[in-house]
């Protein structure tokens, strides 16, 4: 039976590359973005089956999104959480509203989508979740204390959840990218930052998508953090 895949943040960057790769493998893909028109455009481009809008900081919108997916495609088998934001600043200069936004979107939103997806997966007696973290969650970085906290929190959450649901044949893993060519890395000084990467370049979203697919389809891997960073962690 064809798998149903929900990709939050699936309209751009890594999420879009994941949506495209899953669609190419003939999975039923729902592309989810805050902006419905952007989601529709991305879904049409990558060959997805459904486009939906959802603000993951709002629990009621997440609930409505899963209802739409179930009604249109069926129960969710695979969940990919790629929705995220960045608000870089030294902690003393970080606004309280930015702290709340970062934690709400990057961490709490992912927790809520996982909670809703589990209901479908338990009915299906199996499933897989891949949450997109960051090398910053592993190693830390100046000016990204809250962002790093949200991503490291995601790792702790994912490992704990993997233990909770393993007996139900549900797997939970994390992909932690380094410097990847996406909207989030626009404006960075690529020439100087590339010198920190042993492989000598930024990665492409498609390379991260391959790692996500690997974890979704690997039946004996759970609770794992797969770092995709060109060796950046070796230098940090």
Swiss-Prot record:
Position of the signal peptide: none
Active site positions, chain numbering: 147
UniProt binding sites for substrate: 134
InterPro entries: NAD(P)-bd_dom_sf (IPR036291), Sc_DH/Rdtase_CS (IPR020904), SDR_fam (IPR002347)
Subcellular location: Mitochondrion matrix
Top-tier EC class: oxidoreductase
Pathways involved: Lipid metabolism; fatty acid biosynthesis
Binding site for NADP(+): 11-14, 34-35, 55, 82-84, 147, 151, 180-182
GO cellular component: mitochondrial matrix; oxidoreductase complex
Function (record text): The heterotetramer with HSD17B8 has NADH-dependent 3-ketoacyl-acyl carrier protein reductase activity, and thereby plays a role in mitochondrial fatty acid biosynthesis. Within the heterotetramer, HSD17B8 binds NADH; CBR4 binds NADPD. The homotetramer has NADPH-dependent quinone reductase activity. Both homotetramer and the heterotetramer have broad in vitro substrate specificity and can reduce 9,10-phenanthrenequinone, 1,4-benzoquinone and various other o-quinones and p-quinones.
Full protein name: Carbonyl reductase family member 4
């Amino acid at each position: 039976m064809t798998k149903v895949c929900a990709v939050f943040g699936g309209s751009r960057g890594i999420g879009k590359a994941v949506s495209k790769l899953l669609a190419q493998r003939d999975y039923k893909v729902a592309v989810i973005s805050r902006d419905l028109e952007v989601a529709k455009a991305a879904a049409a481009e990558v060959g997805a089956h459904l486009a939906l809008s959802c603000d993951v900081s709002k629990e009621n919108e997440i609930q409505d999104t899963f209802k739409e997916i179930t009604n249109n495609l069926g129960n969710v088998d695979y969940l990919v959480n790629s929705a995220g934001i960045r608000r870089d600043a030294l902690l003393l200069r970080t606004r309280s509203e930015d702290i709340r936004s970062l934690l709400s979107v990057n961490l709490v939103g992912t927790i809520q989508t996982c909670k809703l997806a589990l209901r479908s997966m338990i009915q299906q007696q199996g499933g897989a979740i891949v949450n997109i973290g960051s090398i910053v969650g592993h190693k830390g970085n100046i000016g990204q204390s809250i962002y790093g906290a949200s991503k490291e929190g995601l790792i702790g959450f994912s490992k704990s959840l993997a233990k909770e649901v393993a007996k139900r044949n549900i797997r939970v893993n994390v992909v932690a990218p380094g410097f990847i060519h996406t909207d989030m890395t626009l404006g960075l000084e690529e020439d100087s930052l590339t010198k920190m990467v042993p492989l000598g370049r930024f990665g492409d979203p498609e390379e991260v998508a391959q790692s996500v697919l690997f974890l979704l389809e690997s039946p004996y891997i759970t609770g794992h953090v797969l770092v995709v960073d060109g060796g950046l962690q070796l230098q940090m």
